[in-house]
């Protein structure tokens, strides 16, 4: 029976393998999708303009609120930009309640967000209540969901991702809902900029890094997405609508589905059971929200078909989303039977041998490795197709996978070398810590400057 189990795991590992040639095809396909998205709206890659035309230099100063609405948490921040790439920050963080983020009505989540902002203002800026509008606190709002952005302050939600489902908000300006929530509480706040977290990561990396050639910002967290700097003359859909030589573009690449990359049985089962089945396929291969669930479904299959754990299903394994990606992160610290047993001890598995434990490590590793290899595709595609080949280039990244998943960036770089050869050495990849907060403040500063004619 153990021999059959070993063969089953080997097949699973093979199913999650993407060879170099498949990745090269994906690089070409990604660029074709990018070009279509720059031509017109409504394409697979949204290629949404951020209405930010320049990157910060590191010299920027100012005090701003930032509100970060991500896939798991809500953060309210007060940020002081000190210049020289430095900043100070105060913040509070709250977990998004399930009853608010899966609700027909938008009111519960707006009430939740507005109430937390009110508590933050009462704690840190009580004297601001009742001040004239010209003294309101400027805020940058990070809204990390696919949206049609029509100005620096207007962003219309296209669809929910990361497990959220609030139908009333679809095709609506979410920031306007927030503004109404603030007004109902007489909060002294003015939203100056609405950005995506990838744009925040990009501008934060440009602000804090000593590198002068930052061109991408990428999120590898609950979901995945990227932003980059594009030349205005390469964006036909903005012809005559914007000034300046460049535009920051939020790509919304989580929606990509490469025809050249196959889906495993576990991918198909996972996708079927998500609120947005058939969509965000790339994100469901790479996002931290999904890797643990893919592993859980693999374990379920091994128990059911190959009698792993004596065919017994621990209650924690039968529930969807019960195995988080942090479990895989802990497993990847060391390939040893002892480590696997310790990490999976809460699931009460009965291992027949140390080898069986190592087989599970191999299965988990294959899922994470595929995610890292797929993550190299957009980087390689943009590097090759935007005139940067042969040049030093800097990429800012943020999110739980690059921070906490062992060797994720190493595996990404391995695939990058396969795709662009020695050029991989010219690409620096660095953490843009607090990109969603600092980036929102930087974009709010840019918006205020433009409003005053100072940009």
Swiss-Prot record:
Its EC number is 2.7.1.1. GO terms for biological process: canonical glycolysis; glucose 6-phosphate metabolic process; glucose metabolic process; glycolytic process; intracellular glucose homeostasis. Residues 196-434 are annotated as: Hexokinase large subdomain. ATP binds at residues 68-73, 222, 288-289, 325-329, 400-404. Residues 3-445 form the Hexokinase domain. Substrate binds at residues 144-145, 161-162, 196-197, 225, 252, 283. InterPro entries: ATPase_NBD, Hexokinase, Hexokinase_BS, Hexokinase_C, Hexokinase_N. Keywords: ATP-binding, Glycolysis, Kinase, Nucleotide-binding, Transferase. The keyword Transport does not apply. One of its GO terms (molecular function) is glucokinase activity. Pathway: Carbohydrate metabolism; hexose metabolism; Carbohydrate degradation; glycolysis; D-glyceraldehyde 3-phosphate and glycerone phosphate from D-glucose: step 1/4. Residues 57-195 are annotated as: Hexokinase small subdomain. Gene3D superfamilies: 3.30.420.40, 3.40.367.20. It is an enzyme of class 2 (transferase). It catalyses: a D-hexose + ATP = a D-hexose 6-phosphate + ADP + H(+); D-mannose + ATP = D-mannose 6-phosphate + ADP + H(+); D-fructose + ATP = D-fructose 6-phosphate + ADP + H(+); D-glucose + ATP = D-glucose 6-phosphate + ADP + H(+). Monomer. Catalyzes the phosphorylation of hexose (six-carbon sugars) to hexose 6-phosphate. Phosphorylates D-glucose, D-fructose and D-mannose. Compared to hxk1, has a much higher affinity for D-glucose. Constitutes the initial enzyme of glycolysis by catalyzing the phosphorylation of glucose to D-glucose 6-phosphate. This is Hexokinase-2. It comes from Schizosaccharomyces pombe (strain 972 / ATCC 24843) (Fission yeast).
């Amino acid at each position: 029976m153990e021999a059959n189990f070993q063969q089953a795991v080997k097949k699973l590992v093979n199913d999650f393998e993407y060879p170099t040639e498949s990745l090269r095809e994906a690089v070409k396909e990604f660029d074709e999708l990018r070009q279509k998205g720059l031509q017109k709206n409504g394409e697979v890659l949204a290629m949404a303009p951020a209405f930010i035309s320049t990157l910060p230099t590191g010299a920027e100063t100012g005090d701003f609120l930032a509100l970060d609405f991500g896939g798991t948490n809500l953060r309210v921040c007060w940020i002081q930009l000190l210049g020289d790439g430095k900043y100070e920050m105060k913040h509070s963080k709250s977990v998004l309640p399930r009853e608010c983020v899966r609700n027909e009505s938008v009111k519960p989540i707006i009430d939740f967000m507005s109430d937390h902002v009110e508590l933050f203002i009462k704690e840190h800026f009580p004297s601001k209540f009742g001040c004239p509008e010209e003294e309101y606190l400027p805020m940058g709002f990070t809204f990390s969901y696919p949206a049609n952005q029509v100005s620096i302050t207007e962003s219309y939600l296209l669809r929910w991702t990361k497990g959220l489902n609030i139908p009333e908000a679809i095709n609506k300006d979410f920031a306007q809902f927030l503004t109404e929530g603030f007004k109902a509480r007489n909060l002294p706040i003015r939203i100056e900029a609405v950005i995506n977290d990838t744009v925040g990561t990009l501008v934060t990396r440009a602000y804090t890094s000593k590198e002068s050639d930052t061109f991408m910002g990428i999120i590898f967290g609950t979901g995945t997405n990227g932003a980059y700097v594009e030349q205005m003359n390469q964006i036909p859909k903005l012809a005559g609508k914007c000034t300046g030589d460049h535009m920051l573009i939020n790509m919304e690449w989580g929606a990509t589905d490469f025809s050249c990359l196959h889906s495993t049985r576990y991918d198909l089962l996972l996708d079927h059971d998500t609120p947005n089945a058939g969509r965000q396929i790339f994100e469901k291969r790479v996002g931290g929200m999904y890797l643990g669930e893919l592993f859980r479904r693999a374990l379920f299959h091994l128990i059911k078909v190959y009698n792993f754990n004596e065919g017994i299903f621990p209650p924690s394994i039968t529930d969807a989303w019960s195995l988080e990606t942090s479990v895989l992160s802990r497993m990847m610290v060391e390939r040893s039977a002892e480590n696997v047993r310790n990490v999976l001890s809460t699931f009460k598995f009965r291992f027949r041998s140390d080898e069986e434990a190592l087989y599970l490590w191999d299965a988990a590793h294959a899922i994470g490795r595929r995610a890292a290899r797929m993550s190299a595709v957009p980087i390689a595609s943009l590097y090759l197709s935007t005139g940067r080949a042969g040049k030093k280039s800097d990429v800012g990244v943020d999110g739980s996978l690059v921070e906490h998943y062992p060797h994720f960036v190493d595996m990404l770089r391995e695939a990058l070398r396969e795709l662009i050869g020695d050029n991989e050495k010219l690409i620096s990849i660095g953490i843009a810590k607090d990109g969603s907060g600092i980036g929102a403040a930087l974009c709010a500063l840019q918006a205020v400057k433009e409003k005053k004619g100072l940009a």
